[in-house]
Amino acid sequence: MLVGSDGGVAFSASGGSLETRSKNFHTAQYYTVAVAPFNMFKNGKTVVYGYDPEQGSWDPDASGGAGSFVYKMFTTIEGHNDVFSGGMQDNGTSIQADNDDGFSLANDFGSGDGAATMFSQNNNNRYVVYNYVYNNSVRVLNLNPGQSNDRAGRYRISNNEDDEGDFINRATLDSNLGIIYANAGNGNVRAYYNWDDFSNANSVKDNYVISGLGATATALNVAQFQNQTSTLYVGTENGYLWKVSNAENTSNQTKEIISGNDFIGSVSDIEFGKDENEIFVTFYNYGVKSIFYTSDGGQNWASKEGNLPDIPVYNILQSPLDSDEVIVGTELGVWFTNNFSSENPTWAQANAGMKDLRVTDMDMRKG
């Protein structure tokens, strides 16, 4: 399990207590973190080159004679089980890989502010989506074996300067169908598609807009329980939870509000349990109930606030081994409960080795 916060990254090798950060090289906060599936890099070799020209030198004969920087900083991924990435404040998007829960170097393959970062969950098509601010520069790094991952080989999904969405923009990935959904502001979500065959690195990819959601999207997630259609869930800044069925089909979409009556504030996270009927929703405001759960697809909602202090909650994860074990990332670090099914769960801090910092994102390795 990987936890990103104002103080950098902490990790848990067992899904339990967080390890002490003995190597404090990250000074910038991680806005987002992402973990590759366990067996994604079991076979084949992938080399990711860094972005920073100061780590390389200019070669006038590279890129077919056009000249380019030859980078010295690179990460080799070959048989690694622990591969993770994240978007950092002012420090681009990094990638790390190791096999022994030990110290590994972070390699910045982006630049500027790193934002939404998402690994493919399809082991047969390896890539990581990364973003600069707004929707100005959404890109995909092809991690399939044998690919060139220098700067020229990265795939451009969007390239504009109209500042669509938020500065650090919310997004989600349907890696079954190859669609990136990103907040586009004003009640809209932009969907980028027709790119995951990696046929043209430099062309801006096709996109369409899902409109009529009423307010800015502050949380998005795709239910990854089937691969024929795309069901998108969108939480908004005015406290609504939308379900968009057939989100991949511009002519056959259906949108419905499945919010609870007690939803007040801005939605910060949407996660799923064992199936699409189990949905977890959190809010990042003070003075409101921050954690809700449904087991019937949104027909009935229960507050799971319990004894949690009045603090913003930014993200939530359920243990895949015990449905009663749930953790949340908050303004004051990570909190956990072992009795989530109770009407009033008992929450306690789980910050061993990590300070009382804002936890901006959490991700759990699949597969």
Question: Could you tell me what each predicted segment is?
Answer:
Residues 1-367:
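Beta-propeller blade termini and top-face loops
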